[in-house]
Amino acid sequence: MEKQVLVVFPHPDDEAFGTAGLITKFVNEGVPVTYACATLGEMGRNMGNPFFATRETLPEVRKKELQDACNAMGVKDLRMLGFRDKTLEFEDPELLVSTIGKLVDELKPSLIITFYPEYGIHPDHDACSAAVIETLKRMPKEDRPTVYALPITPDREAVLGKPDKVFDVTDVLETKIKTIEAHRSQTEAMVARLEDGSMDPNSEMMSFIKKESFWIYPFDE
């Protein structure tokens, strides 16, 4: 059993589709989970139809959604790191490393969950996960936590091979769907299909939601 899990993502909702089930499992097992979210996703373009937010109010909307998602998963320790959305690739890498390093020093996690650097599609995803890996590379090997890395590019298996860990999360599917629903500003169309039953339970999307796959990051010594 893990002694402490640290989840590091750049945006609210990054945890919802690929990791919410595993996070919930850890919480249910009594494992302490800390979720560090680098930004509030305040530059997101989806503000609803009809509009539920303006550019000025969107940060608070997404902050509340993130808090609701954590409540759904049972995560009590949410850290909002205060970086600006869509700018992580332009931040001083040392500032990102320092910020994450302080969390690692404080929490001493046995496992970190983040995106897989260079396979995150979004520049913020790659910058955030690269900072996590750089932080850990500077640690003594014997103190370094395991990293469950989440690649989301279409070619991930062709390049990286099969995932090292695949978790069936059907036993916590209800909680995972509540987590997805919490981020309504980003998932409104999917939530509508889940709520009205129009999503085929055998669809590729439902299969994706029911299983979570990770690659253990291979540190080059």
Which stretches of residues belong to each language-model region?
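Active-site rim/loop-helix segments in enzyme catalytic domains that contact anionic ligands
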Residues: 1-107, 137-143
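Metal-dependent de-N-acetylase/amidase catalytic core
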Residues: 2-8, 29, 76-77, 86, ...
